[in-house]
Amino acid sequence: MTIYHFVGIKGSGMSALAQILHDKGFQVQGSDVDKYFFTQKALEEKQIPIMTFSADNIQEGLTIIAGNAFPDTHEEIERALELGLSVIRYHKFLGQLIDGYTSIAITGSHGKTSTTGLLSHVVGAIRPTSYLIGDGTGSGTKDAEYFALEACEYQRHFLAYKPTYAIMTNIDWDHPDYFKSVDDVFNAFETLGKQVKKAVFALGDDAELRKLTLDIPIIYFGFGEENEFQAKNVIKETTGTKFDVYHREEFLSSFEIPAYGDHNVLNALSVIALCDYEGLPVEDVKNELKTFEGVKRRFSITEKGNQVLVDDYAHHPSEIRATVNAARQKYPDKKVVAVFQPHTFTRTRTFLQGFADSLNLADEVYLCDIFGSAREKTGNLTIADLAHKTKGNHIIKEEHTEELLKYPEAVILFMGAGDVQKFQAAYEKVLDHEFLTEADLKKSAIN
């Protein structure tokens, strides 16, 4: 029996794909760096072996699935090629895997992971569904009819897919190390659209997506009157958001989600539209929307005393803006403190003023050093260039997170696509020490 070996198994997509193959009964293993990543927890729970990168890991009989971050010169891939083993890139393997299902590719500059998670939750509760989510979660469900997958636009990798449906959440200029302009991004999305078999669900409030020209139906959703599926009468509460949905100006139903911000209404609306198109019962869809608990690293809340710590993947000005607004909806009486770690020097340089403008929507801003991606380790700017444009000109270090104790009633947003979680972990240790010290003082006073 073939053993699938994943080169870079801790990558979010790779981890999810490994879990899918494991669930389908295949033997799976993989390798990566020794550093801990949140994606490996699910792998460990399923007892999928994780090794440290080494050419010695590559033996006869393996089929190699290579992560897109690793070139053919990587020691394990080189050894595999020397042995004449089959080496296939992640996105190409996934493109082959989804054939035979009613596949739904969820793409967009922002909101892919949250929407894929929501769709998987809703459709999966109604019909057997396999799914691959960009937070490292994957499931190869037995006898699945549907396959929901997050489709990343970077380097046009999503062009390896020919899905039944696509959901396009928005188009924005991101990944400036690859895409040269928003027009370049649009061209990639339109090319994907031409590969979709049945229909594309697209945000009609997005000027770029309105330019799509395809031979299949484009079902537009959004807040605007011109959309086929429209969200109206939005009520924002501290417990979530309620809204009505109209289909071609006819009332469909009222919905409720335990999530915050306009972006989450739109994510839910895309799922509602697809489910309606597929004839899934609206009452079932309503019930499942109410129970979605979110995906990893997307507004993930930890309460510590009177402080609320939020872990979020936001790494683009538009995403930061959405996260700050969501925090203000859920916690209207709390101060919002942003702790942000920029991801890649190219993105930071390109959107420097945009980052400053969105971060300054928070009450206080703290910046971590720029996180260089695997493709880009250094740059000719520093975090000070961004700090000069933000409130307070604060730069925070992992070993000095106690500065955040100054905001005892605040919501603290730890945002970034790198390893900003280590700053939150360091601060939680500070808080735990503070709570212990306070408890000791009270105990001494009683005695």
UniProtKB/Swiss-Prot annotation:
Entry GO CC: cytoplasm
Top-level taxonomic group: Bacteria
Listed Pfam families: Mur_ligase (PF01225), Mur_ligase_C (PF02875), Mur_ligase_M (PF08245)
InterPro entries, alphabetized: Mur-like_cat_sf, Mur_ligase_C, Mur_ligase_C_dom_sf, Mur_ligase_cen, Mur_ligase_N, MurCDEF_pg_biosynth, UDP-N-AcMur_Ala_ligase_MurC
HAMAP family linked to this entry: MurC
Function, as annotated: Cell wall formation.
Name of the protein this chain belongs to: UDP-N-acetylmuramate--L-alanine ligase
Gene behind the chain: murC
